[in-house]
């Protein structure tokens, strides 16, 4: 004699199994859409070097530390970048020498490297 056991219940209710999978998929899809919108909310962020120099570049965690030339504006050098919200590290390359802006917040790595740090907020 064959009898149904509680463990066999899932075999006969395959529709119930699919429902949570669909709900889970929709939840994932929602999370992805929210993340896309969050990353798309870049904020115009001004970087200014006031320490003089002839050639000034900006490098940071927001551009994989590649050199971005700053534009001379009167006695300063300026760049305006659209950055995603969050914390970013950066420093300046002034006439071939890496430096940070002593008038802005800094963070020191375990290796002793000093970078400026900026919080981009809404």
Swiss-Prot record:
Record-stated family: Belongs to the 5'-AMP-activated protein kinase beta subunit family.
Domain characteristics, as noted in the entry: The glycogen-binding domain may target AMPK to glycogen so that other factors like glycogen-bound debranching enzyme or protein phosphatases can directly affect AMPK activity.
Top-level lineage group: Eukaryota
Residues recorded as bearing Phosphothreonine in the entry: 113
GO biological process: fatty acid biosynthetic process
Entry keyword annotation includes Lipid metabolism: yes
Record keywords: Fatty acid biosynthesis, Fatty acid metabolism, Lipid biosynthesis, Lipid metabolism, Phosphoprotein
Name assigned to this protein: 5'-AMP-activated protein kinase subunit beta-1
Free-text function comment from the UniProt entry: Non-catalytic subunit of AMP-activated protein kinase (AMPK), an energy sensor protein kinase that plays a key role in regulating cellular energy metabolism. In response to reduction of intracellular ATP levels, AMPK activates energy-producing pathways and inhibits energy-consuming processes: inhibits protein, carbohydrate and lipid biosynthesis, as well as cell growth and proliferation. AMPK acts via direct phosphorylation of metabolic enzymes, and by longer-term effects via phosphorylation of transcription regulators.
Annotated spans, Glycogen-binding domain: 33-122
Record-annotated disulphide pairs: none
The keyword Lipid metabolism belongs to this UniProt entry's keyword annotation: yes
Organism: Sus scrofa
A Pfam short name: AMPK1_CBM
Sequence positions bearing Phosphoserine: 5, 61, 66, 73
Family matches, as InterPro entries: AMPK1_CBM, CRP1_MDG1_kinase, Ig-like_fold, Ig_E-set
Subunit structure: AMPK is a heterotrimer of an alpha catalytic subunit (PRKAA1 or PRKAA2), a beta (PRKAB1 or PRKAB2) and a gamma non-catalytic subunits (PRKAG1, PRKAG2 or PRKAG3). Interacts with FNIP1 and FNIP2.
Entry comment on modification after translation: Phosphorylated when associated with the catalytic subunit (PRKAA1 or PRKAA2). Phosphorylated by ULK1; leading to negatively regulate AMPK activity and suggesting the existence of a regulatory feedback loop between ULK1 and AMPK.
Gene that this polypeptide is encoded by: PRKAB1
SUPFAM superfamilies per UniProt: E set domains (SSF81296)
């Amino acid at each position: 004699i064959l009898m149904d056991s509680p463990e066999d219940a899932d075999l006969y209710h395959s529709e119930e199994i699919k429902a949570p999978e669909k709900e889970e998929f929709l939840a994932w899809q929602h999370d992805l859409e929210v993340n896309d919108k969050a990353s798309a909310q870049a904020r115009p962020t001004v970087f200014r070097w006031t320490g003089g120099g002839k050639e000034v570049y900006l490098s940071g965690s927001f551009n994989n530390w590649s050199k971005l030339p700053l534009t001379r504006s009167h006695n300063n050098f300026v760049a305006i970048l659209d950055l995603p919200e969050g914390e970013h590290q950066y420093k300046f390359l002034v006439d071939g020498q890496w430096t940070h802006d002593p008038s802005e917040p800094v963070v020191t790595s375990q290796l002793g490297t000093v970078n400026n740090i900026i919080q981009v907020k809404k």
